[in-house]
């Protein structure tokens, strides 16, 4: 097979030689005949079989013998034979020019063969004729067995040019030939008969009758030769079509005789696939020359319809264009151009000429053969191509290397890029339609189908909870949710289930990363519940006992990408929520769905193949921003009351609990019925490879969190009262939270801060509600006639983001410090409530011991500013002694005085910044103050270690327990820093001592001074972003209109104007008193808070100032060994550290005992029988010991 024919040609459009009138032209197998080209006649005729159909009058045509013309003869004469009757199959055949090859009787010849046969070189003319004669003598392997119509016979008329003559195209004498440039014609050219042709007559009749816009052409009569292999006449499946052609100016080539040639199909192995454009007027590829005849029996030989085609120029640099691969299939060498790109804004095709003669387009630049140049009529048809290769074909590496790389930058193949935001392809705006919906108990409740894509990969589809999302528009307060008849899916129908665990996730404006981090961790914890197949509570269907509730504080505050994440899980759908129902404002939008997929923090779907089980979800989107306390009221009073769960877990968006944290948290309630609340360990998120610890602020918080979970939480858990259960990871027993019959209880006190107004809200209560997670702790332990305790669960851990910038860190600690301080004051003032509880006497004694410890801690917190200054004053001032000065020349004295006055000025600056500036507006000043505090702390630490080392290495002083320096310094340091190391090793978690301890001790003065000062100076700020008065007033009316005119109401009569003036004069004369409006509740509340803030700051500042000045003046002239206040301070710190260490050690021992007891009970069950009753007695004894320890 010819390698050039490995694929079909890239052009497949009809030839260009005629329009609706088909004039036969030429006989060249190359399908080309120039009007002015010279060709030689082949004197060897071949036999022609005439048509056999006698139905119509046909004109048999014979070729007259030709004679060679002299060089002076301009052309050869051609004369038609006289008209005769229609020949029968028995008549002698008519001679016609022979085909090129005997084997190509199907007329499917290549252009190369045609050129060699009909345009020989002058020196090879004789040889060519000889070769043709030899080929004629050979028998044809496939004799012609097909019939041909008269029109086809006319297309085979031979021209008889003489050497030096020119071939001429037959023209209709009645047609205007203004567009055709004729050559000199011979005198004996055949003439077309007078009158209109049969084809033209039928065409005009159709136009006259108005049958169709493009009339069809009746099939020509055909004559058949008897062929046993051929079938009967098969109707054509291709509708008759007319041709339109691109207008041009001049032509030097004739049409092709192979327009009607039968097709043998393109060679196999082609991979070409065309494409169509979406715009009218773009070139299409519905027809190829090879598709003109599907078989030899077709009678439908009409032309294809007009396509507004565009072709290559007829000439190539002034010479006829050579043949192309399509010549083998009867195509034209003048190739149609490929279609324009899909989105190219090409104009409509230019209407064709009425003339049937097509001519070429002149090229002004002989080096430029591009018809789409700037001077062409087709310049706007499509973008400028880089080269002549098709857009559908890929360029070879050689072509890419040879081409100019700048050409690709000069031309835009697809036009300019669209500006502005573009809609995604295939995405449309939602089509809204009005529907009548039946209200349920007067409320709007909708069951909405989930998206098709989500439904397609769900493993479970049997229940409505998997296939439909339920939307409820809640128009009432959360306290009235159940009373107004609102229900959840877990309370009706087939999905009625008992809820064991109710998880609340509160969020404000967090992005999708924080939300998916928390939600994916929760779903993995639910999978762990279902994996405990041996549990009596959980198992494969354990997910049916867990409900996750997401409460978002404000519809306009939620992050849009978080909504997208919820929509991807099937929980949320856009366009369903409504603002009001029957003129009642919607307070919250509740979405319910049981999702089976999860999104991790990388926003990748995780499903059942990753162990994810179904999760019952409730998404409550509050209409307004009403603070986190209101979100908890929706959770506890609305949804909790409807579900009545056993345990409620509170999480914040951004917190990532570990894989088994929620199970350990629930297990604490399951094993001890007296536990009302529990919490886990909060860890700072360190980032990949702990890179977040490079930030000193993050490292110091990591150390603080670790030591709190090692020393403080275990100590308080031993006593049974944890001062704060962090809202980021805590759990409560729902039954313990309920109010008593009089309406008083933990929840009523907890939500009291949401309804405080005016002076009735004292500043202590208001600040206490800033740390709302401390409220429930005290109310649960002090609940009347109950013995609830709080527990710390070491096995429950959760990572959370910590502030990494100074302003965010200060703002967070302001709420924490004020809430902790005022909550401690509140619990100490109301400690008598413990006496009315049902706790055991031992538990009450332990609780009073804890109150004493909290009181001491509170006193140290209140005077922490003075204690820091005095510690620095005495320790750093100890180096001013000339005997101890490590630098000599009184350099230590100079450094001490500089740092001393810097410390005093810095503390004063902190008050000024805290009273009048936000941390976000004074970022640099706060950062500078923290750096100076760090320098002071580093010098104080250096002085401490220098004094200790000098004391140990001094030969004059003996080291003994009664020595003041040894007692005050060494014992104090070992009882703090040393205890930190010992307890960290005991809990097998010492790494924070290596990575974060130095940062914490350096930033310790900033914790004491910067954070404490800012917190006390902003006790009046108890708002959580409450909206101001942003409602437009309407009491004065308005001016409404369009354009330059408006409509308004105003006095129109002169009497009204005079009356108003008279009233104004009378008021001035009578001196009427104008009543002053009373101050608003918000103004009274703000004034009250600020006044309390002033009294509190003055009290705190004066107390610390008096303590610092008095102690520094009394002991300024004495040494460290004789400073009794410093001795008291250091020993108090050591005592508190030891107390915390003892409590933490007790907690660790009790945990080990519980583990041993549980293990021993399991072992005794497997003890051999010869133990007798000893086994049972040991088990009972250990169980009683365990119960006593827990109570």
UniProtKB/Swiss-Prot annotation:
Induction section of the entry: Exhibits higher expression levels in hyphae than in germinating conidia.
Region Disordered, annotated ranges: 1-172, 202-407
Biological processes per GO annotation: chitin biosynthetic process
Composition-biased stretches (Low complexity): 54-88
Topology in membrane: Multi-pass membrane protein
Alphabetical list of InterPro entries matching this protein: Chitin_synth, Chitin_synth_fun, Chitin_synth_N
Residue spans crossing the bilayer: 816-836, 855-875, 893-913, 929-949, 968-988, 997-1017, 1095-1115, 1129-1149
Entry function: Polymerizes chitin, a structural polymer of the cell wall and septum, by transferring the sugar moiety of UDP-GlcNAc to the non-reducing end of the growing chitin polymer. Shows additive effects in septum formation with CHS1, CHS3A, CHS4, CHS5, CHS6 and CHS7. Regulates mycelial growth and conidiation. Involved in virulence and mediates mycotoxin deoxinivalenol (DON) biosynthesis via the regulation of the expression of TRI4, TRI5 and TRI6. Plays an important role in the response to cell wall stress.
Domain of life where this protein originates: Eukaryota
Biased composition (Polar residues): 102-111, 124-133, 146-158, 239-255, 285-294, 390-400
Family: Belongs to the chitin synthase family. Class II subfamily.
Source organism: Gibberella zeae (strain ATCC MYA-4620 / CBS 123657 / FGSC 9075 / NRRL 31084 / PH-1)
Protein's UniProt name: Chitin synthase 2
Predominant localisation class: membrane
Feature: compositional bias, Basic and acidic residues: 36-45
Keyword terms of this UniProt record: Cell membrane, Glycoprotein, Glycosyltransferase, Membrane, Transferase, Transmembrane, Transmembrane helix, Virulence
CDD domains reported in the protein's UniProt record: Chitin_synth_C (cd04190)
Residues the record marks as carrying a glycan: 4, 108, 525
UniProt note: phenotype after gene disruption: Resulted in reduced mycelial growth and virulence, and increased sensitivity to various stresses. Leads to increased expression of CHS1, CHS3A, CHS4, CHS5, CHS6 and CHS7 chitin synthases.
Signal sequence, renumbered to the chain: none
GO cellular component, as recorded: cell septum; plasma membrane
């Amino acid at each position: 097979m010819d390698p050039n024919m490995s694929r079909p040609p890239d052009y497949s459009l009809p030839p260009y030689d005629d329009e609706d009138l088909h004039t036969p032209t030429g006989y060249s197998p190359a399908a080309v005949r120039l009007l002015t080209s010279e060709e030689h006649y082949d004197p060897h005729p071949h036999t022609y079989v005439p048509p056999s159909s006698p139905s119509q009058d046909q004109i048999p045509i014979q070729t007259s013998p030709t004679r060679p013309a002299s060089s002076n003869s301009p052309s050869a004469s051609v004369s038609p034979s006289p008209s005769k009757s229609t020949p029968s199959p028995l008549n002698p055949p008519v001679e016609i020019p022979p085909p090129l090859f005997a084997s190509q009787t199907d007329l499917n010849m290549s252009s190369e063969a045609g050129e060699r046969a009909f345009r020989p070189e002058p020196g090879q003319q004789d040889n060519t004729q000889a070769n043709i004669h030899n080929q004629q003598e050979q028998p044809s392997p496939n004799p012609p067995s097909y019939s041909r119509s008269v029109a086809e016979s006319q297309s085979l008329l031979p021209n008889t040019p003489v050497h030096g003559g020119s071939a001429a195209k037959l023209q209709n004498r009645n047609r205007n030939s203004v567009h055709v440039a004729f050559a000199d014609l011979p005198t004996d050219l055949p003439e077309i008969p007078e009158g209109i042709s049969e084809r033209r007559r039928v065409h005009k009749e159709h136009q006259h009758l108005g049958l169709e816009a493009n009339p069809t052409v009746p099939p020509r009569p055909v004559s058949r030769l008897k062929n046993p292999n051929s079938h009967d006449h098969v109707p054509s499946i291709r509708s008759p079509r007319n041709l339109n052609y691109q207008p041009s100016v001049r032509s030097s080539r004739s049409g092709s005789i192979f327009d009607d040639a039968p097709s043998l199909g393109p060679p196999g192995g082609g991979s070409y696939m065309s494409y169509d454009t979406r715009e009218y007027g773009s070139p299409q590829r519905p027809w190829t020359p090879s598709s003109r005849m599907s078989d030899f029996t077709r009678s439908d030989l009409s032309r294809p319809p007009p396509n507004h085609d565009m072709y290559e120029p007829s000439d190539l640099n002034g010479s006829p264009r050579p043949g192309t691969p399509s010549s083998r299939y009867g195509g034209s060498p003048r190739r149609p151009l490929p279609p324009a790109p899909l989105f190219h804004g090409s104009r409509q095709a230019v209407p064709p000429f009425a003339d049937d003669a097509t001519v070429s387009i002149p090229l002004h630049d002989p080096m430029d053969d591009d018809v789409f140049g700037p001077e062409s009529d087709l310049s706007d048809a499509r973008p400028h191509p880089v080269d002549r290769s098709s857009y559908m074909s890929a360029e070879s590496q050689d072509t890419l290397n040879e081409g100019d790389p700048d050409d690709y930058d000069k031309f835009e193949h697809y036009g300019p890029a669209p500006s502005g935001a573009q809609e995604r392809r295939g995405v449309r705006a939602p089509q809204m339609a009005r529907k009548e919906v039946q209200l349920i108990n007067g409320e709007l409740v909708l069951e909405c189908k989930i998206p098709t894509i989500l439904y397609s990969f769900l493993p479970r589809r049997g229940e409505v909870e998997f296939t439909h999302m339920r939307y409820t528009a809640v128009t009432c307060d959360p306290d009235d949710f159940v009373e107004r008849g609102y229900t959840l899916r877990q309370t009706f129908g087939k999905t009625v289930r008992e809820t064991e665990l109710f998880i609340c996730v509160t969020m404000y404006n967090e992005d999708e990363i924080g939300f998916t981090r928390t939600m994916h961790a929760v779903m993995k914890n639910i999978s762990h519940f279902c994996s405990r197949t041996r549990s009596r509570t959980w198992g494969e269907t354990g997910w049916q006992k867990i409900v996750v509730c997401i409460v978002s504080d404000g519809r306009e505050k939620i992050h849009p990408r978080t909504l997208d994440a919820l929509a991807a899980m099937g929980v949320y759908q856009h366009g369903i929520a409504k603002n009001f129902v029957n003129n009642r404002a919607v307070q919250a939008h509740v979405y319910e769905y049981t999702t089976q997929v999860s999104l991790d923090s990388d926003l990748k779907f995780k499903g059942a193949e990753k162990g994810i089980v179904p999760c019952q979800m409730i998404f409550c989107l509050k209409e307004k921003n009403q603070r986190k306390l209101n979100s908890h009221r929706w959770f506890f009073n609305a949804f909790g009351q409807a579900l009545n769960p056993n345990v409620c877990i509170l999480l914040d968006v951004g917190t990532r609990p570990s894989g088994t944290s929620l199970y350990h948290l629930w297990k604490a309630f399951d094993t001890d019925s007296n536990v009302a609340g529990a919490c886990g360990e909060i860890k700072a998120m360190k980032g990949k490879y702990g890179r977040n610890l490079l930030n000193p602020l993050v490292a110091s918080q990591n150390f603080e969190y670790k030591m709190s979970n090692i020393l403080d939480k275990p100590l308080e858990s031993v006593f049974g009262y944890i001062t704060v259960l962090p809202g980021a990871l805590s759990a409560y027993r729902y039954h313990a939270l309920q109010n008593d019959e009089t309406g008083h209880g933990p929840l009523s006190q907890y939500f009291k801060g949401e309804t405080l107004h005016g002076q009735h809200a004292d500043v202590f209560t208001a600040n206490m509600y800033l740390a709302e997670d401390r409220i429930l702790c005290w109310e649960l332990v002090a609940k009347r006639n109950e013995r609830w305790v709080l527990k710390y669960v070491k096995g429950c851990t959760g990572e959370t983001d910590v502030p990494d910038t100074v302003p965010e860190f200060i703002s967070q600690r302001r709420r924490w410090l004020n809430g902790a301080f005022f909550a401690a004051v509140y619990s100490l003032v109301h400690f008598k409530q413990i006496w009315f509880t049902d706790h055991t006497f031992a538990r009450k004694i332990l609780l009073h011991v804890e109150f004493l410890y909290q009181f001491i801690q509170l006193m140290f917190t209140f005077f922490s500013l003075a204690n820091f200054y005095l510690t620095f004053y005495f320790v750093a001032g100890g180096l001013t002694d000339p005997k101890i000065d490590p630098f000599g020349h009184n350099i230590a004295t100079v450094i001490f005085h500089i740092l001393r006055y810097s410390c005093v000025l810095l503390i004063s600056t902190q008050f000024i910044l805290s009273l009048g500036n936000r941390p976000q507006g004074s970022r640099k000043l706060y950062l500078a103050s923290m750096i100076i505090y760090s320098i002071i702390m580093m010098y104080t630490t250096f002085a401490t270690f220098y004094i200790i080392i000098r004391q140990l290495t001094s030969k004059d002083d003996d080291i003994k327990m009664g020595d003041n320096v040894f007692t005050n310094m060494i014992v104090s340091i070992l009882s703090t820093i040393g205890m930190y190391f010992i307890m960290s090793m005991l809990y097998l978690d010492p790494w924070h001592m290596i990575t974060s301890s130095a940062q914490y001790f350096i930033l310790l003065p900033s914790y004491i001074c910067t954070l404490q000062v800012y917190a006390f100076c902003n006790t009046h700020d108890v708002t959580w972003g409450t909206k101001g008065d942003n409602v437009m007033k309407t009491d004065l009316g308005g001016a409404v209109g369009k354009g330059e005119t408006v409509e308004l109401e105003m006095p129109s009569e002169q009497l009204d104007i005079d009356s108003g003036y008279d009233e104004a004069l009378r008021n001035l004369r009578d001196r009427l008193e104008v009543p002053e409006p009373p101050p608003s509740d918000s103004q009274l509340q703000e004034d009250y808070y600020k006044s309390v803030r002033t009294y509190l700051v003055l009290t705190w500042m004066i107390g610390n100032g008096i303590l610092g000045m008095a102690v520094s003046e009394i002991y300024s002239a004495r040494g460290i060994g004789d400073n009794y206040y410093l001795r008291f301070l250091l020993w108090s710190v050591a005592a508190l550290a030891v107390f915390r260490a003892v409590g933490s050690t007790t907690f660790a021992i009790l945990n080990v005992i519980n583990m041993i007891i549980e293990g021993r009970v399991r072992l005794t069950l497997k003890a051999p029988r010869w133990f007798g009753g000893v086994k049972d007695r040991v088990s009972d004894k250990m169980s009683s010991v365990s119960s006593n320890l827990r109570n």
